[in-house]
């Protein structure tokens, strides 16, 4: 984020970052006065930011009641991930066809940085979660960066940001993740090797399976939350 950005841009960047990274949770009320105090910005840029984020689907505006962080749902997640898999496959095929030695070197660098970031296993490891998430995003971006289409990359980046919101929800869930749940390092290495071998079909298949496993894990979490909420409602 740019520390010298105009106030409306700064407000948008700060709010978007906190929503995507779990500092502002799904369903949380967003009061303009509270956000002004939180960010040290005026009400006008805060309101402009809320309108922009509502257009992106990250904020829900409520008549005469302000705004809330948009809810998460299995339906939205499935739609989001289906779209991301399609776009990421297209980007990946184009990047494999177009990528040069510098692109390959950046993939190797990004994979090295990701492999050095410990996979978080507890919601208490917030700094570790943030670092791993950043390295993970960099790796996925490196894979598709040579696709040659600014439009595709913008669409991919937006889908990746929204899907990371769901991934972060799982990482911040009040449960520890068992080490045997899955080995994402093995998955990432397999994808990287297929990409560097210029085997587009294998790379796309591995990426589709990789994203599908993440989707399944988050769906399980959302189902558990729904069941818990229903149980609490029945016992209230």
Segment roles from a protein language model:
Residues 1-97, 220-236:
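Short linear motifs at protein or domain termini
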Residues 80, 97, 101-170, 187-194, ...:
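Conserved amphipathic alpha-helical segments that form helical-bundle/coiled-coil interaction surfaces
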């Amino acid at each position: 984020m740019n520390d010298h950005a105009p106030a409306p841009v700064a407000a948008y960047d700060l709010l978007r970052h906190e929503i995507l990274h779990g500092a502002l949770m799904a369903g949380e009320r967003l009061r303009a006065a509270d956000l002004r105090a939180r960010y040290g910005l005026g009400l006008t840029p805060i309101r402009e930011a809320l309108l922009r984020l509502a257009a992106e689907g990250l904020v829900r505006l409520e008549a005469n009641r302000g705004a809330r962080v948009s809810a998460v749902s299995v339906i939205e997640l499935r739609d989001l991930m289906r779209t991301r898999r399609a776009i990421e496959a297209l980007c990946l095929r184009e990047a494999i066809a177009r990528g040069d030695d510098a692109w390959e070197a950046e993939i190797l660098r990004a994979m090295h940085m990701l492999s050095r970031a410990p996979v978080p296993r507890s919601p208490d490891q917030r700094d570790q979660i943030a670092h791993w998430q950043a390295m993970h995003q960099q790796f996925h971006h490196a894979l598709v960066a040579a696709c040659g289409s600014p439009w595709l990359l913008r669409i991919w980046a937006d889908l990746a940001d929204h899907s990371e919101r769901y991934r972060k929800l799982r990482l911040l869930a009040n449960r520890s993740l068992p080490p045997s749940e899955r080995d994402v390092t093995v998955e990432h290495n397999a994808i990287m090797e297929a990409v560097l071998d210029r085997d587009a079909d294998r790379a796309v298949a591995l990426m589709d399976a990789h994203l599908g496993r993440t989707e399944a894990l988050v769906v399980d979490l959302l189902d558990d939350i729904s069941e818990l909420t229903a149980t609490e409602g029945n016992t209230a």
